[in-house]
Amino acid sequence: MKPDHPLSGAVVLLFAVACGLAVGNVYYAQPLLDAMAEAFAMDPATIGIIITLTQIGYGVGLLLLVPLGDLLNRRRLIVLQTLLSALALLMIALAPSSTWLLLGMALTGLLAVVTQVLVAYAATLAIPAQHGRVVGVITSGIVVGILLARTVAGGMADLAGWRSIYLLSAGLTLVMALLLFRVLPRHEDARPDSAYGALIGSVFTLFKEEPVLRQRAILALLTFASAMVLWTPLVLPLSAPPLSLSHTEIGLFGLAGAAGALAAARAGHLADRGLGQWTSGLSLLLMLASWLPIALTQSSLWALLLGVITLDLGLQAVHVTSQSMIYSVRPEAQSRLTAGYMLFYSIGSALGSIGSTAMYAWGGWIAVCWLGAGISAVALIYWWLTLAAKTPNTCGKPPRHSYRQSPRLIHGPCPATCCPAPHRGAPNRETTPPPGAAARSGTIDTPDTYVPCAGMQTPAYSPAGSTAVATSC
């Protein structure tokens, strides 16, 4: 059942708050790593294992739990996962040993994937024209939840110890479960006629079938690895001499990141206008540039502030754009697309967490910054390579060519003989051929080329007078 009216602002806001609260549970530990290490006599050089196990749990949840959103009633699944999250948080708050702490962290990560079920559910409920805006608002809620989690956790730790934030979050999560049960729209969509195992396998099938998902998933791995290289070990230089900041002061840097994340919300609008690729490129460049001021952390906290804002602005702009792009690919598989994409996000976060603390133990803060900058550079290069690669066109959308001409455009339906089933009848633009070139059925448009659709082996016209290769519609 397709939505026939847009989601209200209040419901979108509830989705955003619920996502922010759920994902914040994963990040409370970041400014508290030194306190946890002291409480359980853990080596500070390996304390990153707490974040890594949480991200591993998150990755397992993405693979095993998120696809259930395409099989089961999403509303009930969301409420159940939220209730179980409250129990996992209580386990952390009452942990008597590091073993129970790590188990609670892994379970918290596993159940925090309710965030992605919420995102996919919101995308299903939204009308196509508001996909980018809805995803942008909810993603901003997620990011603000991540960043404010650090701030609130730091303040609570100074006031009442590191366990207090988990007790508070358990109570808030329980209240949110009740709100979601009362407010979430009752929406039933067609369910795939497949078993759970086949559904999980279809996540990997989507990677084979959808190049956009593959490209954006790898970008997610690299960008979130770079971000976690900053956030995981940041507490170590800030809490040590000569800075010796308190947990509250360390957590305040999360507010700086929140400012950058909120500014990235507009990336969804740009993606809706077809500017997703170039938004991604500019954002990746910002991420790379951010490591220069971050490297000056121990001599200037203002430089760190600038770097944090820039890094999170770039990170979230890429993230919002990627989600908007992949959700447009296969509307009937929103949860599985989310699972596949966010699985790479989780892998990148886990690798960045464990790698950054190891680099800090080996070479200090400068080594951490070199690692983060290197990963950001790889992400930028990868984006450029995928942009330069020649990819098939999609029905009704111009390919990625330079706009050297402004040809006359004829607007009409995309021919059924050309388009895949999901796109038949979709609006299309056809470039008018020059005088003497007969119009051929099934053409697609480009700004400077007149070409037939895939499977139609007829000559094509191009401004240079050459024969264009048939392109898939």
PLM feature spans:
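Juxtamembrane intracellular "pre-TM" segments in multi-pass secondary transporters
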Residues: 2-5, 185-217, 403
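Conserved MFS/SLC helix-loop-helix module at the cytosolic interface between two early adjacent transmembrane helices
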Residues: 60-98
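Helix-to-loop junctions at the C-terminal end of transmembrane segments
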Residues: 62-73, 262-276, 360
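Structural signature of the two symmetry-related core transmembrane helices
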Residues: 76-90, 170, 278-293, 373
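Cytoplasmic helix-loop-helix junction between adjacent transmembrane helices
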Residues: 104-141
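Intracellular juxtamembrane helix-capping segments at the cytosolic ends
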Residues: 114-126, 317-330
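Helix-loop-helix hairpin linking two adjacent transmembrane segments in secondary transporters
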Residues: 137-182
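C-terminal transmembrane helical hairpin of 12-TM major facilitator-type secondary transporters
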Residues: 277-322
